[in-house]
Amino acid sequence: MTRHPSSKRLRATVIVRREEGILLAVDHSGLVLLPGGGVDHGELPLVAAARELNEETGLIATALQFLFHHESPTNLHHVYYCVAEGIPTAADDAERLLYLDQPANASPLNLSAATRTILARYQAGGRC
């Protein structure tokens, strides 16, 4: 995994919005996250976003648009909006998938702090 000069891990984070809502992945510990993961050495964040989305959900990214960076205590997230094809199926680090249909419905979910912040910024119209 590639590190930012500040020694933070580089991550590609993907927002897929469908009719059902925003796609989220639940990991094996029950933590709810946006699909995504580490950027491999020499890999472009855009390529990592498409790869991680496919690994975790089986979806194929047909269009990715950079939205913004989000810096957490340990990671530097490259956040992308994604149009994707396919039927989502949990795989890799995702134990199951779910959709967030309304921002108000996020409070009972065990969202990671970064996911909560990224979603809030996206829903407020966050851009680069």
Residue ranges and their predicted role:
Residues V16, V79-V83, Y99-D101:
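Short, well-ordered beta-strand micro-motif
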Residues G58-P88:
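Active-site segment of metal-dependent pyrophosphate-handling enzymes
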Residues R17-E55:
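Conserved Nudix-box catalytic region and its N-terminal flanking loop in Nudix hydrolases
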Residues M1-I22:
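Conserved N-terminal beta-strand and adjoining loop/helix that marks the start
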Residues R9-T13, N75-V79, A114-R116:
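Short hydrophobic/aromatic beta-strand or adjacent loop that forms the aromatic wall/cage
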Residues L31-P35, H41, Y81-C82, D93, ...:
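Functional cleft and adjacent loop/helix regions within the main domain
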Residues A90-C128:
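NUDIX/MutT-family hydrolases
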Residues H4-K8, S72-T74, A91-A94:
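A generic structural micro-feature
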